[in-house]
A protein has these predicted regions:
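Short gly/pro/ser/thr-enriched loop/turn and capping motifs at secondary-structure boundaries
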Residues: 84-89
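Iron-sulfur (Fe-S) cluster-binding modules
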Residues: 1-54, 59, 63-78, 98-247
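Portal/gating segments that form or line small-molecule/metal binding sites
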Residues: 94
Length: 247
């Protein structure tokens, strides 16, 4: 019997699920390995339990917390899927400001309506036990397929343990620091095929920190290129990465 897979969305843009919906022929191949029983963007079905639950989005309300805990109870394996689920994502930017001020700015006179109640954003693993993560904003489709196949076969999923800079070297990219741009590639986990630096856009850390980031190397690169820590600290906040990685 094929493992039963469900996709669930919380506070997010649902772009990671769109990445999977756009797999087209490849998702048909995935369906040969797993039984997709719940995926709101693709089908109307639902299920009572799951072998693998993929959670997209951060937790920002009491109702989110209750729902993700319920999904956890009904799932053998729970995977946080995409930067919002994995890190808290851009939604965690609101945690840097007064909550009432943020709600007034976004919702105006309706800021205190009960259905708009919210609390400080949390990543999924900050609320429930998580068995695996698929990082990125959006997720890398090839990596998604690889990890889901591994989980379906009972194998531990593997993420790259080296930084984005390695992938830039493989692609013969000119280092963005050499053209005067700040970039978080030296401390960000690879696996995206260096897609942003390849298109002359700085890595902003959407995949989270590489294990044991080389802080000294990062500081040396910044100093060599005359880039301030303040500028880089602002980049760290985009995906809720702790800037204390560079104390």
């Amino acid at each position: 019997m094929k493992p039963r897979v469900g996709f669930f969305d919380f506070t997010c843009c649902e772009g990671c699920q769109l990445q999977i919906a756009d797999l087209e022929e490849e998702i048909i191949g995935l369906a040969d390995i797993v039984d997709i029983v719940e995926f709101r963007e693709v089908l109307t079905g639902s299920a009572a339990s799951y072998d693998i639950a993929l959670i997209e989005g951060s937790i920002t309300r009491n109702s989110d917390e209750e729902r993700v805990k319920d999904i956890r109870k009904r799932s053998k394996i729970l995977v946080e899927f995409g930067a919002c689920a994995h890190l808290g994502g851009v939604n965690k930017l609101k945690n840097l400001r007064d909550e009432t001020a943020v709600r007034r700015e976004v919702y105006g006179d309706a800021w205190n309506m009960p259905h708009l109640n919210t609390y400080p954003t949390r990543a999924v693993h900050e609320v429930v036990k998580v068995d695996a993560a698929i990082p990125g904003c959006p997720v890398n489709r090839r990596e998604f397929i690889t990890i889901v196949k591994a989980l379906a076969m009972g194998l531990p999923p593997k993420l790259p343990d080296y930084p984005v800079c390695v992938e830039c070297k493989k692609r013969d990219n000119v280092c963005l620091y050499d053209i005067g741009m700040a970039c978080l590639g030296p401390v960000t986990r690879a696996g995206c095929d260096a897609i942003c630096p390849t298109h002359k856009s700085a890595c902003e850390g959407c995949r989270g920190l590489v294990p044991d980031p080389n802080k000294n190397s990062m500081r040396d690169v910044l100093a060599k290129n005359g880039i301030s820590l303040d500028e880089v600290f602002r980049m760290f906040t985009m995906y809720a990465i702790d800037p204390e990685v560079l104390p």
